[in-house]
Amino acid sequence: SQIGLLINASVTRDNFEPAVSVGVHDRLELPRHALNFDITNACLGFVNAMTVASTMIDAGAIDYALIVAGEDPSPWHRTAVRILNNPDSTREDVLAQFATLTLGSGAAAAVIGRADRHPEGHRIVGSVSRAGTEHRNLCIGGEADQGMNTDAEGLLKHGLELVAQAWEQAHQDGWEWNDMTSYVTHQISNAHTNAIIEAVGIERERIPLTFPKWGNVAAAALPMTLAECAPTYTKGDRILCMGVGSGLNTALLEIQW
Protein backbone atom coordinates (compact mmCIF):
# COMPACT_ATOMS: atom_id res chain seq x y z
CA SER A 1 0.00 0.00 0.00
CA GLN A 2 3.02 2.31 0.40
CA ILE A 3 4.28 1.82 -3.17
CA GLY A 4 3.66 5.06 -5.05
CA LEU A 5 5.41 4.15 -8.29
CA LEU A 6 5.98 1.03 -10.37
CA ILE A 7 8.41 1.13 -13.31
CA ASN A 8 8.92 -1.75 -15.69
CA ALA A 9 12.30 -1.48 -17.40
CA SER A 10 12.41 -4.64 -19.52
CA VAL A 11 13.32 -4.75 -23.19
CA THR A 12 11.23 -7.77 -24.18
CA ARG A 13 7.45 -7.67 -24.07
CA ASP A 14 4.49 -9.75 -25.19
CA ASN A 15 2.62 -6.88 -26.85
CA PHE A 16 3.25 -3.36 -28.05
CA GLU A 17 0.48 -1.82 -25.92
CA PRO A 18 -0.52 -1.46 -23.16
CA ALA A 19 2.59 -0.99 -21.02
CA VAL A 20 3.99 -4.10 -19.35
CA SER A 21 3.73 -2.24 -16.05
CA VAL A 22 -0.07 -2.46 -16.01
CA GLY A 23 0.05 -6.25 -15.93
CA VAL A 24 2.59 -6.22 -13.11
CA HIS A 25 0.54 -3.63 -11.22
CA ASP A 26 -2.59 -5.76 -11.55
CA ARG A 27 -0.99 -9.08 -10.60
CA LEU A 28 0.70 -7.57 -7.55
CA GLU A 29 -2.57 -5.87 -6.58
CA LEU A 30 -0.81 -2.57 -6.05
CA PRO A 31 -2.92 0.38 -4.87
CA ARG A 32 -4.79 2.50 -7.39
CA HIS A 33 -2.78 5.56 -6.40
CA ALA A 34 0.46 3.89 -7.56
CA LEU A 35 1.66 5.50 -10.78
CA ASN A 36 2.92 2.90 -13.25
CA PHE A 37 4.68 3.04 -16.60
CA ASP A 38 7.46 1.50 -18.69
CA ILE A 39 10.93 2.92 -19.24
CA THR A 40 12.40 1.30 -22.33
CA ASN A 41 15.96 2.28 -23.11
CA ALA A 42 17.52 -0.96 -24.28
CA CYS A 43 19.79 -2.56 -21.66
CA LEU A 44 20.07 0.71 -19.71
CA GLY A 45 16.42 0.82 -18.66
CA PHE A 46 16.83 -0.43 -15.08
CA VAL A 47 19.54 2.10 -14.21
CA ASN A 48 17.44 4.88 -15.76
CA ALA A 49 14.44 3.72 -13.73
CA MET A 50 16.48 3.87 -10.51
CA THR A 51 17.45 7.46 -11.32
CA VAL A 52 13.87 8.51 -12.13
CA ALA A 53 12.46 6.82 -9.03
CA SER A 54 15.06 8.27 -6.67
CA THR A 55 14.50 11.74 -8.12
CA MET A 56 10.74 11.46 -7.53
CA ILE A 57 11.38 10.31 -3.96
CA ASP A 58 13.76 13.22 -3.31
CA ALA A 59 11.13 15.59 -4.74
CA GLY A 60 8.57 14.30 -2.24
CA ALA A 61 6.22 12.96 -4.92
CA ILE A 62 6.35 9.37 -3.60
CA ASP A 63 7.75 7.47 -0.64
CA TYR A 64 8.50 4.12 -2.28
CA ALA A 65 9.05 2.81 -5.80
CA LEU A 66 9.17 -0.71 -7.20
CA ILE A 67 11.33 -1.29 -10.27
CA VAL A 68 11.08 -4.53 -12.24
CA ALA A 69 12.57 -6.06 -15.37
CA GLY A 70 11.82 -9.50 -16.77
CA GLU A 71 13.47 -10.64 -19.99
CA ASP A 72 12.51 -13.53 -22.29
CA PRO A 73 14.40 -13.31 -25.60
CA SER A 74 13.42 -16.81 -26.77
CA PRO A 75 11.17 -15.55 -29.64
CA TRP A 76 14.14 -13.56 -30.99
CA HIS A 77 16.34 -16.64 -30.60
CA ARG A 78 13.96 -18.61 -32.81
CA THR A 79 14.00 -15.89 -35.45
CA ALA A 80 17.81 -15.76 -35.42
CA VAL A 81 18.02 -19.55 -35.83
CA ARG A 82 15.52 -19.40 -38.71
CA ILE A 83 17.59 -16.72 -40.45
CA LEU A 84 20.84 -18.63 -39.99
CA ASN A 85 19.31 -21.92 -41.13
CA ASN A 86 18.39 -20.35 -44.45
CA PRO A 87 20.61 -21.91 -47.15
CA ASP A 88 21.22 -18.42 -48.51
CA SER A 89 22.46 -16.98 -45.20
CA THR A 90 25.82 -15.22 -45.35
CA ARG A 91 28.70 -14.31 -43.08
CA GLU A 92 27.05 -10.93 -42.61
CA ASP A 93 23.89 -12.67 -41.37
CA VAL A 94 25.94 -14.59 -38.80
CA LEU A 95 27.59 -11.39 -37.55
CA ALA A 96 24.26 -9.54 -37.41
CA GLN A 97 22.54 -12.33 -35.44
CA PHE A 98 25.38 -13.37 -33.14
CA ALA A 99 24.51 -10.89 -30.37
CA THR A 100 20.93 -12.19 -30.32
CA LEU A 101 22.18 -15.70 -29.57
CA THR A 102 24.04 -14.44 -26.47
CA LEU A 103 20.86 -13.10 -24.84
CA GLY A 104 19.62 -14.81 -21.68
CA SER A 105 16.38 -14.97 -19.74
CA GLY A 106 15.96 -13.62 -16.21
CA ALA A 107 14.31 -11.07 -13.97
CA ALA A 108 15.15 -8.61 -11.22
CA ALA A 109 13.32 -6.19 -8.95
CA ALA A 110 14.27 -3.44 -6.53
CA VAL A 111 12.39 -1.39 -3.96
CA ILE A 112 13.63 2.17 -3.46
CA GLY A 113 12.49 4.26 -0.52
CA ARG A 114 13.20 7.43 1.40
CA ALA A 115 16.62 7.50 3.05
CA ASP A 116 15.34 9.28 6.16
CA ARG A 117 13.03 6.35 6.88
CA HIS A 118 15.70 3.73 6.26
CA PRO A 119 19.10 4.98 7.46
CA GLU A 120 20.33 1.39 7.42
CA GLY A 121 19.60 1.04 3.70
CA HIS A 122 21.82 1.19 0.64
CA ARG A 123 21.89 4.79 -0.57
CA ILE A 124 21.83 5.95 -4.19
CA VAL A 125 24.44 8.70 -4.09
CA GLY A 126 24.35 10.12 -7.61
CA SER A 127 24.84 9.45 -11.29
CA VAL A 128 26.34 10.74 -14.52
CA SER A 129 24.99 9.95 -17.98
CA ARG A 130 25.97 10.47 -21.58
CA ALA A 131 24.16 10.06 -24.92
CA GLY A 132 25.68 9.10 -28.25
CA THR A 133 22.50 8.92 -30.27
CA GLU A 134 24.30 9.35 -33.58
CA HIS A 135 24.98 5.61 -33.17
CA ARG A 136 21.31 4.68 -32.90
CA ASN A 137 21.41 2.37 -35.95
CA LEU A 138 24.07 0.00 -34.61
CA CYS A 139 21.45 -2.26 -33.02
CA ILE A 140 17.91 -2.41 -34.37
CA GLY A 141 15.39 -4.72 -32.76
CA GLY A 142 11.98 -5.25 -34.28
CA GLU A 143 9.07 -7.55 -33.54
CA ALA A 144 10.11 -11.07 -32.61
CA ASP A 145 9.44 -12.43 -36.10
CA GLN A 146 11.64 -9.68 -37.58
CA GLY A 147 14.58 -10.32 -35.26
CA MET A 148 17.38 -8.04 -34.14
CA ASN A 149 20.32 -6.89 -36.25
CA THR A 150 23.46 -5.82 -34.41
CA ASP A 151 26.79 -4.32 -35.38
CA ALA A 152 28.59 -5.81 -32.38
CA GLU A 153 31.97 -4.34 -33.29
CA GLY A 154 30.51 -0.86 -33.70
CA LEU A 155 28.58 -1.12 -30.43
CA LEU A 156 31.72 -2.12 -28.56
CA LYS A 157 33.85 0.65 -30.04
CA HIS A 158 31.41 3.54 -29.67
CA GLY A 159 29.83 2.27 -26.45
CA LEU A 160 33.19 2.26 -24.70
CA GLU A 161 34.01 5.71 -26.05
CA LEU A 162 30.77 6.92 -24.46
CA VAL A 163 31.55 5.23 -21.13
CA ALA A 164 35.00 6.86 -21.14
CA GLN A 165 33.41 10.27 -21.78
CA ALA A 166 30.99 9.78 -18.88
CA TRP A 167 33.85 8.67 -16.65
CA GLU A 168 35.87 11.77 -17.49
CA GLN A 169 32.87 14.05 -16.96
CA ALA A 170 32.26 12.43 -13.57
CA HIS A 171 35.87 13.15 -12.61
CA GLN A 172 35.48 16.78 -13.68
CA ASP A 173 32.27 17.03 -11.64
CA GLY A 174 34.10 15.88 -8.51
CA TRP A 175 33.16 12.21 -8.38
CA GLU A 176 36.00 9.99 -7.18
CA TRP A 177 35.29 6.59 -8.67
CA ASN A 178 38.82 5.25 -9.16
CA ASP A 179 38.80 3.10 -6.01
CA MET A 180 35.31 1.65 -5.70
CA THR A 181 34.67 -1.60 -3.86
CA SER A 182 32.97 -3.08 -6.92
CA TYR A 183 32.13 -2.09 -10.49
CA VAL A 184 28.89 -3.73 -11.59
CA THR A 185 28.83 -3.48 -15.36
CA HIS A 186 26.34 -4.48 -18.01
CA GLN A 187 27.07 -8.14 -18.75
CA ILE A 188 27.97 -8.83 -22.38
CA SER A 189 31.29 -10.61 -22.98
CA ASN A 190 34.97 -10.86 -22.09
CA ALA A 191 35.75 -8.45 -24.92
CA HIS A 192 33.38 -5.87 -23.43
CA THR A 193 34.83 -6.35 -19.94
CA ASN A 194 38.40 -6.02 -21.19
CA ALA A 195 37.47 -2.87 -23.10
CA ILE A 196 35.98 -1.25 -19.98
CA ILE A 197 39.11 -2.08 -17.99
CA GLU A 198 41.27 -0.47 -20.67
CA ALA A 199 38.99 2.53 -21.18
CA VAL A 200 38.76 3.69 -17.55
CA GLY A 201 41.61 1.85 -15.82
CA ILE A 202 39.76 -0.20 -13.21
CA GLU A 203 40.90 -3.51 -11.73
CA ARG A 204 39.53 -6.72 -13.22
CA GLU A 205 39.17 -8.27 -9.75
CA ARG A 206 36.57 -5.64 -8.84
CA ILE A 207 34.26 -6.47 -11.76
CA PRO A 208 31.86 -9.36 -11.05
CA LEU A 209 30.98 -11.46 -14.08
CA THR A 210 27.68 -13.25 -14.55
CA PHE A 211 27.41 -13.47 -18.35
CA PRO A 212 29.24 -16.85 -18.43
CA LYS A 213 26.30 -18.24 -16.44
CA TRP A 214 23.30 -16.19 -17.57
CA GLY A 215 24.32 -14.55 -20.84
CA ASN A 216 23.30 -10.97 -21.60
CA VAL A 217 19.97 -10.58 -19.79
CA ALA A 218 19.33 -7.13 -21.28
CA ALA A 219 17.94 -4.63 -18.74
CA ALA A 220 17.88 -7.28 -15.99
CA ALA A 221 21.59 -8.14 -16.34
CA LEU A 222 23.00 -5.39 -14.13
CA PRO A 223 20.50 -5.69 -11.24
CA MET A 224 20.76 -9.50 -11.34
CA THR A 225 24.54 -9.18 -11.00
CA LEU A 226 24.11 -6.67 -8.17
CA ALA A 227 21.79 -9.09 -6.36
CA GLU A 228 24.23 -11.97 -6.88
CA CYS A 229 27.02 -9.93 -5.27
CA ALA A 230 24.95 -8.41 -2.46
CA PRO A 231 25.92 -11.03 0.18
CA THR A 232 29.60 -10.15 -0.31
CA TYR A 233 29.15 -6.41 0.31
CA THR A 234 29.39 -4.80 3.75
CA LYS A 235 28.17 -1.49 5.14
CA GLY A 236 30.12 1.42 3.71
CA ASP A 237 31.17 -0.33 0.50
CA ARG A 238 30.94 1.84 -2.60
CA ILE A 239 29.41 0.23 -5.68
CA LEU A 240 29.43 1.78 -9.15
CA CYS A 241 26.76 0.55 -11.54
CA MET A 242 28.02 1.02 -15.09
CA GLY A 243 25.09 0.69 -17.47
CA VAL A 244 25.12 1.00 -21.23
CA GLY A 245 22.42 0.46 -23.82
CA SER A 246 21.96 0.47 -27.56
CA GLY A 247 21.11 3.85 -28.86
CA LEU A 248 23.74 4.67 -27.55
CA ASN A 249 23.33 5.73 -23.94
CA THR A 250 25.32 5.16 -20.77
CA ALA A 251 24.82 5.92 -17.09
CA LEU A 252 27.17 5.53 -14.12
CA LEU A 253 25.36 5.34 -10.78
CA GLU A 254 26.93 5.08 -7.32
CA ILE A 255 25.37 3.10 -4.48
CA GLN A 256 26.76 3.28 -0.96
CA TRP A 257 26.12 -0.02 0.78
Q: What name fits each language-model region?
A:
Residues 2-7, 28-39, 88-95, 144-147, ...:
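Glycine/charged-rich beta-loop-alpha catalytic/anionic-binding loops adjacent to active sites
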Residues 61-80, 132-138:
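Acyl-CoA/ACP chain-elongation machinery
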Residues 9, 40, 65-71, 112, ...:
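Short beta-strand segments
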Residues 12-14, 31, 38-61, 160-164, ...:
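Claisen-condensing/thiolase-fold acyl-transfer catalytic domains that form or cleave C-C bonds
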Residues 2-4, 31-35, 59-65, 97-98, ...:
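Short coil/turn connectors at secondary-structure junctions
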Residues 15-30, 75-89, 136-140, 192-204:
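Acidic-glycine-rich active-site phosphate/pyrophosphate-binding loop
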Residues 86-157, 244, 256-257:
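Condensing-enzyme catalytic core mediating Claisen C-C bond formation in acyl metabolism
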Residues 1-4, 140-179, 191-200:
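Conserved active-site "lid/cap" helical segment
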